[in-house]
Amino acid sequence: MRIQTLNRDYEILRMAESGERMDVLIARDEKHPEEGKCMLVILKQETDIHRFLPFLAAQQENDPFDDFMGYFPRDGRLYIVFRFSDLMPLRERLSQDTGFEERIMIAGNILKRLVFLHLPAYFQYEVLGEGNILAAENDDIRFSYVFHEPD
Protein backbone atom coordinates (compact mmCIF):
# COMPACT_ATOMS: atom_id res chain seq x y z
CA MET A 1 0.00 0.00 0.00
CA ARG A 2 1.17 3.52 -0.79
CA ILE A 3 0.14 7.00 0.26
CA GLN A 4 1.25 9.66 -2.19
CA THR A 5 1.34 13.42 -1.79
CA LEU A 6 2.84 16.09 -4.01
CA ASN A 7 6.34 15.72 -2.50
CA ARG A 8 6.16 12.33 -0.79
CA ASP A 9 5.56 8.69 -1.66
CA TYR A 10 5.02 6.69 1.53
CA GLU A 11 5.33 2.93 1.26
CA ILE A 12 3.39 1.47 4.18
CA LEU A 13 5.48 -1.15 5.98
CA ARG A 14 2.98 -2.11 8.67
CA MET A 15 0.09 -0.94 10.81
CA ALA A 16 1.31 -0.35 14.36
CA GLU A 17 -2.03 0.52 15.91
CA SER A 18 -5.65 0.93 14.90
CA GLY A 19 -8.49 2.54 16.80
CA GLU A 20 -11.81 4.23 16.36
CA ARG A 21 -10.30 7.70 16.35
CA MET A 22 -6.80 7.13 14.97
CA ASP A 23 -4.50 4.71 13.19
CA VAL A 24 -0.71 4.53 13.33
CA LEU A 25 1.28 3.34 10.32
CA ILE A 26 5.01 2.74 9.96
CA ALA A 27 6.21 3.81 6.53
CA ARG A 28 9.18 4.80 4.42
CA ASP A 29 9.22 7.72 1.98
CA GLU A 30 10.44 6.29 -1.33
CA LYS A 31 11.24 9.80 -2.63
CA HIS A 32 13.47 10.50 0.40
CA PRO A 33 14.86 7.13 1.60
CA GLU A 34 17.73 8.88 3.41
CA GLU A 35 15.20 10.08 6.01
CA GLY A 36 14.60 6.51 7.19
CA LYS A 37 11.32 5.20 8.52
CA CYS A 38 8.51 7.44 9.66
CA MET A 39 5.33 7.06 11.65
CA LEU A 40 2.04 8.30 10.22
CA VAL A 41 -0.52 9.10 12.92
CA ILE A 42 -3.90 9.32 11.20
CA LEU A 43 -6.64 11.28 12.95
CA LYS A 44 -10.02 10.09 11.72
CA GLN A 45 -12.54 12.32 13.47
CA GLU A 46 -13.25 15.90 12.49
CA THR A 47 -13.36 17.16 16.09
CA ASP A 48 -9.86 15.79 16.75
CA ILE A 49 -8.58 17.25 13.49
CA HIS A 50 -9.90 20.72 14.37
CA ARG A 51 -8.36 20.46 17.84
CA PHE A 52 -4.90 19.42 16.60
CA LEU A 53 -4.60 21.52 13.44
CA PRO A 54 -3.69 24.93 14.98
CA PHE A 55 -1.27 23.22 17.33
CA LEU A 56 0.44 21.33 14.47
CA ALA A 57 0.63 24.46 12.32
CA ALA A 58 2.58 26.17 15.11
CA GLN A 59 5.02 23.24 15.26
CA GLN A 60 6.05 23.88 11.64
CA GLU A 61 7.96 26.89 13.05
CA ASN A 62 9.60 24.87 15.87
CA ASP A 63 12.83 23.98 14.00
CA PRO A 64 14.51 22.05 16.85
CA PHE A 65 11.49 19.70 16.98
CA ASP A 66 12.92 17.72 14.07
CA ASP A 67 11.06 14.52 14.98
CA PHE A 68 7.93 16.26 13.64
CA MET A 69 8.14 16.03 9.86
CA GLY A 70 4.83 17.61 8.90
CA TYR A 71 1.19 16.86 8.28
CA PHE A 72 -1.27 16.67 5.41
CA PRO A 73 -5.01 16.14 4.92
CA ARG A 74 -6.34 13.28 2.81
CA ASP A 75 -9.82 11.81 2.40
CA GLY A 76 -11.22 13.72 5.39
CA ARG A 77 -8.42 12.57 7.69
CA LEU A 78 -5.34 14.31 9.04
CA TYR A 79 -1.99 12.55 8.64
CA ILE A 80 0.73 13.61 11.10
CA VAL A 81 4.27 12.50 10.18
CA PHE A 82 6.98 11.81 12.77
CA ARG A 83 10.43 10.22 12.55
CA PHE A 84 10.38 6.57 13.59
CA SER A 85 13.06 4.94 15.73
CA ASP A 86 13.13 1.17 15.91
CA LEU A 87 14.74 0.98 19.36
CA MET A 88 13.81 -0.98 22.47
CA PRO A 89 11.40 0.51 25.01
CA LEU A 90 13.06 2.01 28.08
CA ARG A 91 11.51 -0.62 30.36
CA GLU A 92 13.23 -3.37 28.35
CA ARG A 93 16.53 -1.49 28.33
CA LEU A 94 16.42 -1.02 32.11
CA SER A 95 15.61 -4.70 32.65
CA GLN A 96 19.06 -5.49 31.28
CA ASP A 97 21.97 -5.41 33.68
CA THR A 98 22.13 -1.64 34.20
CA GLY A 99 23.89 -0.13 37.16
CA PHE A 100 22.96 3.00 39.06
CA GLU A 101 25.38 5.23 37.11
CA GLU A 102 24.01 4.00 33.79
CA ARG A 103 20.43 4.65 34.92
CA ILE A 104 21.40 8.20 35.93
CA MET A 105 23.01 8.65 32.48
CA ILE A 106 19.82 7.45 30.77
CA ALA A 107 17.67 9.81 32.89
CA GLY A 108 19.95 12.70 31.97
CA ASN A 109 19.71 11.77 28.29
CA ILE A 110 15.90 11.81 28.50
CA LEU A 111 15.99 15.34 29.92
CA LYS A 112 18.55 16.45 27.33
CA ARG A 113 16.39 15.12 24.51
CA LEU A 114 13.28 16.89 25.87
CA VAL A 115 15.17 20.18 26.14
CA PHE A 116 16.94 19.81 22.78
CA LEU A 117 13.70 19.19 20.89
CA HIS A 118 11.86 22.10 22.57
CA LEU A 119 8.90 19.77 22.82
CA PRO A 120 5.57 21.45 23.42
CA ALA A 121 3.88 20.49 26.70
CA TYR A 122 1.32 18.23 25.02
CA PHE A 123 4.04 16.18 23.33
CA GLN A 124 6.09 16.04 26.54
CA TYR A 125 3.12 14.43 28.25
CA GLU A 126 2.72 11.91 25.43
CA VAL A 127 6.37 10.96 24.94
CA LEU A 128 6.87 10.38 28.66
CA GLY A 129 4.03 7.85 28.63
CA GLU A 130 4.69 4.16 29.09
CA GLY A 131 6.29 2.61 26.03
CA ASN A 132 7.02 5.93 24.31
CA ILE A 133 10.60 6.36 25.57
CA LEU A 134 12.98 4.33 23.43
CA ALA A 135 16.60 3.59 24.35
CA ALA A 136 19.56 2.25 22.40
CA GLU A 137 22.39 0.14 23.78
CA ASN A 138 24.58 3.27 23.75
CA ASP A 139 21.98 5.03 25.96
CA ASP A 140 20.80 7.25 23.08
CA ILE A 141 17.18 8.27 23.68
CA ARG A 142 14.40 8.67 21.12
CA PHE A 143 10.66 9.06 21.48
CA SER A 144 7.66 7.36 19.96
CA TYR A 145 4.77 9.69 19.22
CA VAL A 146 1.87 7.30 19.65
CA PHE A 147 -0.84 9.48 21.18
CA HIS A 148 -3.35 8.45 23.77
CA GLU A 149 -6.86 8.58 22.39
CA PRO A 150 -7.99 12.19 22.99
CA ASP A 151 -10.94 12.65 25.35
Question: Model features per residue range: what roles?
Answer:
Residues 2-63:
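ATP-binding glycine-rich loop module of kinase domains
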Residues 26, 81-83:
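Short, well-ordered beta-strand micro-motif
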Residues 64, 80, 141-144:
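Protein kinase-like catalytic core scaffold
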Residues 67-78:
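Short beta-strand micro-motifs within the conserved protein kinase catalytic domain, predominantly
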Residues 70, 105-107, 114-149:
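Catalytic-loop of the protein kinase fold
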Residues 75, 88-89, 150:
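Feature marks short, surface-exposed loop/turn motifs that line or immediately flank catalytic pockets
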Residues 84-94:
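Structural motif in protein kinase domains
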Residues 93-109:
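Activation segment of protein kinase catalytic domains, centered on the conserved DFG
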